[in-house]
C-alpha cells in the first residue's frame, strides 16, 4: 500500500505578505483535506526548525510569500533538514524575488524589461529622480504589489512624500509602461496560458488581487497572436533558465500603441488563493481545478530527489 506522507503547510511568516500567506495556507489545507492527505498547518516563526523536526513531514508545502518565504531562506532551511518542499529551490527563489537581479537576467536573455535603476530613500525624498513622469517606484524584494507606487504627476509625488514612512532605504524606480497587464502561468515546464487583467483601480494592487470584483480577468488575453506567443516563450524561458520547479507566474505589460511587450518580473511562489491568477489560468487553460492543481504540485515535488541540481544552466553557459 502506498504511504501518504505528512505534509506541513508553511504559511504566515514575517513579511508584509503575511495575511496573503495565511489565506494561501488555508486554501491549500482545505484542498489537501478533501484529497485525504494528512496535512498540518504551521505558522512560521523563529522556532520553525524545531517544529519541523518534531513533525518530520514527508513534504513541506510552501505557502509563504515575500522575504524569508520565497527568497531562498526557508528553502535553505528545508535543504539542511533534508525535507522535500514545493515550488522552486534556493537559487531560483533568491534571484527571482530580487527585481534588480532578475531584470539583469531578463536582459541577458534578450527579454525586454522597463528601464530603471536602484534609488535611495534620500534621493526619493529630495525628488532626485532621473526618470520623467509617469514612473513606478517599488521595493526590491516584495510581492503582491505591496509598496508599489505609480507616480503620474508632481501631485502624486507630493502625496507619496507625505507618506514617507512607506519609502524603503533602497527601492527601484522605473519607467511606467502604459497598456495592458498580462500574467503567464508555467506548470510542469509548459507555459499554459496568459490572462489579461483590467483593474478598476489605477493598477493591479493588493486590493484588486485579493478582493473579488476589483478587477476584470480576460482569458485568453485579447492581444495579437504574436505577442501572446511571446509571453508564453518568455515565461518558459526564464522559468527554465532559473531552474524554477513545478510552477511560476511571469508578469508583463503590453503597450498596443507601439506594439511593445515588457517583462516585469517572475514569481516563483505566486499567490495561491481561490482568487489567484495561476489557479484561474490552470482552470481555464487546462480544466484543472484548485484541488487537482494542489495534487499536481504535491506529486511533482515528491519526485524531485536533487533539489539543488544546477544542470539546467549548462545549455546557457
From Swiss-Prot:
Record's GO cellular component terms: cytoplasm
Catalyzed chemical reaction(s): 2 D-alanine + ATP = D-alanyl-D-alanine + ADP + phosphate + H(+)
Matching InterPro entries: ATP-grasp, ATP_grasp_subdomain_1, D-Ala_lig_Van_CS, D_ala_D_ala, Dala_Dala_lig_C, Dala_Dala_lig_N, PreATP-grasp_dom_sf
Record domain ATP-grasp: where: 103-299
Main enzyme class: ligase
Keywords: ATP-binding, Cell shape, Cell wall biogenesis/degradation, Cytoplasm, Ligase, Magnesium, Manganese, Metal-binding, Nucleotide-binding, Peptidoglycan synthesis
Cofactor(s) needed by this chain: Mg(2+); Mn(2+)
The keyword Manganese appears for this protein: yes
Listed GO biological process terms: cell wall organization; peptidoglycan biosynthetic process; regulation of cell shape
EC number(s) stated in the UniProt entry for this protein: 6.3.2.4
Binding of ATP, residues: 130-183
Superkingdom of the source species: Bacteria
Cofactor note: Binds 2 magnesium or manganese ions per subunit.
PROSITE patterns reported in the protein's UniProt record: ATP_GRASP, DALA_DALA_LIGASE_1
Involved pathway(s): Cell wall biogenesis; peptidoglycan biosynthesis
MF terms (GO), sorted A to Z: ATP binding; D-alanine-D-alanine ligase activity; metal ion binding
Residues involved in Mg(2+) 2 binding: 265, 267
Protein family membership: Belongs to the D-alanine--D-alanine ligase family.
Job description of the protein: Cell wall formation.
HAMAP family to which the protein is assigned, alphabetical: Dala_Dala_lig
Protein name: D-alanine--D-alanine ligase
Naturally occurring in which organism (per UniProt): Wolbachia sp. subsp. Drosophila simulans (strain wRi)
Amino acid at each position: 500500500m502506498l504511504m501518504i506522507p505528512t505534509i506541513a503547510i508553511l504559511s504566515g511568516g514575517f513579511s508584509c505578505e503575511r495575511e496573503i500567506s495565511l489565506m494561501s495556507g488555508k486554501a491549500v489545507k482545505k484542498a489537501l483535506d478533501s484529497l485525504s492527505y494528512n496535512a498540518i498547518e504551521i505558522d512560521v516563526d523563529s522556532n520553525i526548525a524545531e517544529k519541523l523536526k518534531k513533525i518530520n513531514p514527508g513534504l513541506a508545502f510552501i505557502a509563504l510569500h515575500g522575504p524569508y518565504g520565497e527568497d531562498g531562506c526557508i528553502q535553505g532551511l528545508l535543504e539542511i533538514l533534508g525535507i522535500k518542499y514545493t515550488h522552486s529551490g534556493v537559487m531560483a527563489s533568491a534571484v527571482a524575488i530580487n527585481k534588480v537581479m532578475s531584470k539583469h537576467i531578463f536582459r541577458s536573455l534578450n527579454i525586454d524589461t522597463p528601464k530603471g535603476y536602484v534609488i535611495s530613500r534620500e534621493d526619493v525624498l529630495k525628488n532626485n529622480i532621473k526618470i520623467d513622469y509617469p514612473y513606478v517606484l517599488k521595493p526590491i524584494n516584495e510581492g503582491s504589489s505591496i509598496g508599489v507606487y505609480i507616480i503620474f504627476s508632481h501631485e502624486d509625488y507630493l502625496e507619496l512624500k507625505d507618506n514617507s514612512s512607506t519609502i524603503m532605504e533602497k527601492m527601484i524606480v522605473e519607467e511606467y509602461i502604459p497598456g495592458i497587464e498580462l500574467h503567464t502561468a508555467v506548470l510542469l515546464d509548459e507555459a499554459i496560458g496568459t490572462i489579461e487583467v483590467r483593474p478598476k483601480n489605477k493598477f493591479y494592487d493588493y486590493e484588486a488581487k485579493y478582493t473579488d470584483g476589483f478587477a476584470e480577468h480576460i482569458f485568453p488575453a485579447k492581444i495579437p497572436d504574436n505577442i501572446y506567443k511571446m509571453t508564453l516563450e518568455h515565461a518558459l524561458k526564464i522559468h527554465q533558465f532559473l531552474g524554477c520547479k513545478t510552477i511560476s507566474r511571469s508578469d508583463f505589460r503590453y503597450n498596443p500603441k507601439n506594439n511593445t511587450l515588457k517583462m516585469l518580473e517572475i514569481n516563483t511562489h505566486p499567490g495561491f488563493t481561490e482568487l489567484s491568477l495561476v489557479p484561474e489560468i490552470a482552470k481555464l487553460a487546462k480544466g484543472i481545478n484548485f484541488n487537482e492543481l494542489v495534487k499536481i504540485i504535491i506529486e511533482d515535488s515528491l519526485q524531485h530527489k536533487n533539489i539543488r541540481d544546477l544542470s539546467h544552466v549548462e545549455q546557457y553557459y
